[in-house]
UniProtKB/Swiss-Prot annotation:
Superkingdom, taxonomy of origin: Eukaryota
High-level lineage: Eukaryota, Metazoa, Ecdysozoa, Arthropoda, Chelicerata
UniProt-listed InterPro entries: Huwentoxin-1 (IPR011696)
Organism: Cyriopagopus hainanus (Chinese bird spider)
Annotated Pfam families: Toxin_12
Subcellular location: Secreted
Protein name per UniProt: U7-theraphotoxin-Hhn1a 4
The protein's role, per its UniProt record: Ion channel inhibitor.
Signal peptide: 1-19
Propeptide residues according to the Swiss-Prot or TrEMBL record: 20-50
GO MF annotation, one: ion channel inhibitor activity
Tissue expression summary: Expressed by the venom gland.
GO cellular component, one term: extracellular region
Disulfide bond sites: C51-C65, C58-C70, C64-C81
Family recorded in the similarity comment: Belongs to the neurotoxin 10 (Hwtx-1) family. 13 (Hntx-13) subfamily.
């Protein structure tokens, strides 16, 4: 009887240690994933500032991308980037 109780207590202790280690590993992975997402967002923000994409608001200081042109479109009250009907050469 004592051996069975000792085995159960030992098994519970092993499960507790393993689950604690798994939670610590999961938290580290979560933090690493969050940092990676923030890095990707920062990289995409710098790319978005280089030129305005399709239907983006444009002015002299905010140019459209190469395949777009800045046009006034009614009923929108500001200029937007629209396709200039050209295809990029490869």
């Amino acid at each position: 009887m004592k051996t069975a109780i000792f085995t159960v207590v030992l098994a519970l202790a092993v499960f507790a240690v393993l689950s604690f280690g798994w939670e610590a590993n999961e938290e580290a992975l979560s933090e690493e994933f969050t940092e990676l997402i923030h890095e990707k967002e920062a990289a995409s923000e710098t790319e978005a500032r280089e030129c305005r994409y399709f239907w983006g608001e444009c002015h002299d200081h905010m140019p459209c991308c190469d395949w777009l042109v800045c046009r006034y479109k009614w009923p929108i009250t500001y200029n937007i980037c629209v396709w200039n009907r050209t295809f990029p050469e490869k």
